[in-house]
Structure formats: structure tokens, C-alpha cells
């Protein structure tokens, strides 16, 4: 079955932003965009499909690109997950309302073990995914992010910024260095342009966004299980606002890179 980019849709401004971000990814891969709206009951499907199809057809005409409208009935989280599998989605882009809906977002993205989510709150801000920020620590599971960076670079020829916390513990420092070496081996082999930046571990979330304020990345990659912490621990007002502008790609440790033409680790 042909792969697609999935956009869970709710007729909000944020959903429209997600559609634009999805198009940036889809137009290079030539894969269709599927807009999915979930309704409570079967009897509502036909009515809402008419409305969603208007949006899909308008976007398709304006961009000369294939956009499909899909309306399903059922539990929101289960239905999004089931359709993602059914439609062979390899990537999903979803609009969020930030901290206000973080629990809802977590319920969706944690189900998708093999499908990463890009979460957006704003229009495309800096550019077309040609700057990628990858925060790392001593967790080996985070290496899945480097493989997704490799894939995104194949599409956009991106510059990558690895940001890590300076730690005193020798064991943790060794693990961080091992992760950096792992990334270096991948990026150098594929001639991916990258920089490595260290920040103070105290207030890491804010220090990370301070760096991103300077480099202006088009997307930042977090492990799904660290997404909530990475957002809720931001304290500085300027960084709270910045976090709304930079799309977040949530990656699970078991993401199936093989189906994207990458490799396992």
C-alpha cells in the first residue's frame, strides 16, 4: 500500500498549520496527505465528510497536490492510531494548543510506536526543515533520533545542531560522549553538516531553547517519553513563546527506520 502523511484534523487554526507543515514534507516525497477527522458516531460521518472534503479539495487545488479527506467514527485516540496503521502512514503532523492540550497530545503520540509525530502550534516560521536541533543526554534510546535526522537530511539537506547538557558524573559523561560519537559516525558517513553545542544541565529546557533562539531551527527532535518534560520545564517567557513556533518531532525508541530506507541500530 502507498504510504502517506497523516494529519489528524479538527478544523482549528493549528490544524491548518499542520497541513502546511505536512505539505512541506509531502511535496518532496510525492506522497499524499490524508486529513483525518474523528466524530463520535457513524451518523455524523457523511455530514462532516462534506465539510472536510471542501478543505481538502481547496488545498489540493491551490497547491496542485493530492489531499484526501477521511472521516471516521470512534474513540479519538484509538481511531487516529488505527487509521494510521490502515493508511500505512509513515509520519503524522498534528496541530496542538501547547501545554493546554499536552495530555491529549501524549495520548495520541505514545500509541504510535512506529510512526513519529510532528507537533505544531504555529505557521512555518523559519524555513523548510533545513535546520534541525537534536537535544541528547546519556540515554541510548535517543539514538533513534539520529536515524530520523539522516532521513530528513535526505529530503532537505539539513544542518544539524546537537545540544547536550554538561554533567559532572563520569558515567553519564561517558554515555553522552558515546551518543555523540554514534551521531558523528552517521553524519560524517553521509556528509551531513552538523555542530555540537554544550549547555548547563541546570535549567536544561530553558538553556536548550536559548540555543534554539539563536540558531532558529525548523524542527526539534524529542523522544516521545521526554516530550512533556521538555515543554513543561520551560520557565522563561521568551522561551515559552519560542516553543510555540518550533515544530516538535516526537520519536519512539522502536520507530521502524527500515521502512524509510534507513537502517536499524
What do the PLM-derived regions correspond to, one by one?
Residues 1-46, 131-175, 179-195, 217-219, ...:
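Small/aliphatic-rich secondary-structure junction motif
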Residues 25, 79-83, 207, 211:
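CheY-like receiver
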Residues 49-59, 175-187, 211, 232-241:
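Short, aromatic/basic amphipathic alpha-helical patches
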Residues 61-68, 189-195:
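A short helix-to-beta-strand connector/capping loop
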Residues 68-72, 138, 195-200, 227:
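Short, flexible loop segments at the rims of nucleotide/cofactor-binding pockets, characterized by
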Residues 71-79, 201-205:
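Charged docking surfaces used in two-component/phosphorelay signaling
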Residues 79-126, 214, 218-265:
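Gly/Ser-rich helix-loop-strand patches that form or flank binding pockets
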Residues 184, 201-213:
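A short, acidic, amphipathic alpha-helical segment used as a generic capping/interface helix at domain edges
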